[in-house]
Each structure stands twice: as structure tokens, then as C-alpha cells.
């Protein structure tokens, strides 16, 4: 990776909350990240061959695991005073890691596993309900890192109050009901909006009434043209969402988790256009005109779109406008969305 691109990548993952990278400390230091590397100047030194243990450093070794004999070798080395071990398992992943987790925890040596995909990251952390102590995940984009964080349930988005400035009937249109394969809690919903940088938190249908039964797996998200977020942080059009698509579900604190879509339903319904303003940014959404579609208020309360008034405040995710190419954000590109 070219040096300039590497520094942008490191800055991006630092903004996502990553604190340690497997990288030469000279490169990691510029992004104010801790380094794990064979260099003695790393915070976490990976010993190679017969290299001596440097004083005042956390040290470990890297191992490939192909058999039980390799696991025994890891344990023997760990008992010599290693602070951590890095293991790379091949075809069999769960059983070897279960064996090492059980044994290494007794001698207080930390276990870091190599993962090859965001889904593997989550699996590594859930083994034996204890999980490994850390994962070394090869990522080429910030989106890869975001997706891994979503799998862990540690990804969050900044939500802020936005003031409703306009509400207007706009006739019939096609709206998308997203039925997820998850039971959604009160306060959870999807980020949806007509602009990629201004999205409303649209609540799920877990709240029933005397006329409707609860549908806690469903989000009546909005018109077909609207944006929502995929698990890598890139945008999707609601019209693209279908069985098997993975979308982000957020709570009122901005904490995100992934949800698989069981089906989406596109139906023609009367629609409302709603606009709001937050920190000088103005965004809108076209949602079905029905009592069951709710936004989330600051503090976690709910308000139906049919009861909204100018001046009301609802939670949105807003940031300065940026261009997008096939859903991926493009920095420094001029764009004006209305």
C-alpha cells in the first residue's frame, strides 16, 4: 500500500476506535497507534528465531497451528514467559482455539488469533463464551474494519437531535417494509434518508395498538429511493434490499448491530415528505403516512409521523456532505443533494 494511502487508512481506523496495529512502529506512530511488530521499538514485540527478549516490553511469538503437536509447542513456549501468542489456524479453527483458550488462560498468556474475514472476527471472540484476547485481521479498507466492528457489536454512530421544519403530503409512492430475521428491541431502528449524509432513525414496529399487532422484526423504512446503511458503513438504496441482505440496526444511543433481511415488501401507499435541520444541515425523508411509522425522540421516546409537528425534535445521523460512488463515500468530491 502506498505510504500516503496507508496513512489515510490508519487515520480512518483510528477514528473507528482501533488502537493497535500489526505494523512497523515507524508507520504506526504517525497515526498515534500502538504497534505489534518484530521491531524492538514496538510496544508489543513479536520475537523471531532466537531473538532476545527486550526489557520493559510485552513480548510474544507467532505460530501456525496444523496439529495437536503445534498446540503443545505453543504451550511450551508460553510457559517460558511469553506475554502473548499469535496463532494462525488453517482448516480446523474452533477446536484448536478452544483447547488453547482453556490452557493459556491458566498461565495468563494472552491469545491473539489471525482472522480472514469480519465474520471470522466475531467467531473468534465467541469461542467458549470467553473468546480469544484479540484478533489480527487483515483489512485493506476502513469499510472492512467497520464491518468487523459491527459483527462485534462495538460499532456506533453519532446521533443528534434534529428540528422538524416541514411536513407535507406528497401523494402515493412505493415504500419498502424491511422484515429482518431478528427480533428488534424498543428504541431500535434503521437509519433512513433521502440524503446519504442525513438519515432519520426509523423505529421498528414492536409497538402494537388496538388496531395492529406488534411486528418487532419489521421496519417500515421509507420510499424506494431512500438510503440506508449496510454492515460496512456504505449506503444501500431501499429498493436494493432483499432476502439475505445485511443491514445496520441502531438503538437510540447509536450502537449498531447487523441484521439479516428475511424479506422486503414494496407496496404503493400514501406518503409524507418530512424535513429536519441539525447543525446547519437539512435533510428529508419520504415515509408512509400511517400511525405505525415512528421516529425516535432524544431520550428514547417515540413519535408517530402522523403526530409530528414543526419544531418537534427527532434523532438523526448527520454529517457534512460527501460524494458517493456505488455507495462508497468519496472524500473531497463536490456534491449537492436537495
Swiss-Prot record:
Keywords: Amino-acid biosynthesis, Aromatic amino acid biosynthesis, NAD, Oxidoreductase. GO terms for molecular function: 3-dehydroquinate synthase activity; dehydroquinate synthase activity; NAD binding. It catalyses: 2-amino-2,3,7-trideoxy-D-lyxo-hept-6-ulosonate + NAD(+) + H2O = 3-dehydroquinate + NH4(+) + NADH + H(+). It comes from the Archaea. InterPro entries: DHQ_synth. It holds the Pfam family DHQS. Belongs to the archaeal-type DHQ synthase family. HAMAP family: Arch_DHQ_synthase. Catalyzes the oxidative deamination and cyclization of 2-amino-3,7-dideoxy-D-threo-hept-6-ulosonic acid (ADH) to yield 3-dehydroquinate (DHQ), which is fed into the canonical shikimic pathway of aromatic amino acid biosynthesis. This is 3-dehydroquinate synthase. It comes from Cenarchaeum symbiosum (strain A). The lineage of its organism: Archaea, Nitrososphaerota, Candidatus Cenarchaeales, Candidatus Cenarchaeaceae, Candidatus Cenarchaeum.
